[in-house]
């Protein structure tokens, strides 16, 4: 990045992305949360496709389409929540949803769904797109052309936004067993398929990308089981070790390019070696 003409742009977007993430987790109503959710999607698209060449532009367009599709269902869920509960503040929505008995008929058929189930399913689809849950996972494995610090932020923070959203709205999701069953099924399916795909990759970044999808699947499973506190613990643990692994992988790739004819001298990178070893143990669930 030292010789990159877009170095200043990269650092500015990086700082704005972190700021948007911090503001998003501090929101107490849907309006502000959706605004920073959108900013996060925008910065994510710009950062993860930092270099303008053919494959990057193609994957950037795919990312834009998938994230926008999820955002449409998210805003639809917000609109229905406002129609049902008359407010967008989380605390008031939780209180009013617990006593609401609204029933919707789907397409005029005999199939009926409660208002809280409809709202939570639509919001969950938005979380699926952000956290790369199957079948909305296609954008993540193809967006691996950016500098490694971007991937450390992306996989350790931004992709966790979907899991955070479900945990933040835990009182609302807990009111719908139907939605929790759907979340559990999608999370289980994602965890199994993503970890299986991870095992057959021969590119280290794609391997870590699919591992992130699998970890997000585990987090969704925990939310589907009602273990929202465990999901938050998983979010923090995953963010710490995935950021460390990505940064150390980036250092390894960089040094392999500088010294292609000989292995990197390990004595100069003791800290990276030890931190990678600890992160690998955590990743393997050897340490709680």
Please name every model-derived segment.
Residues 1-288:
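...captures the hydrophobic TM-helix bundle architecture rather than a specific catalytic motif
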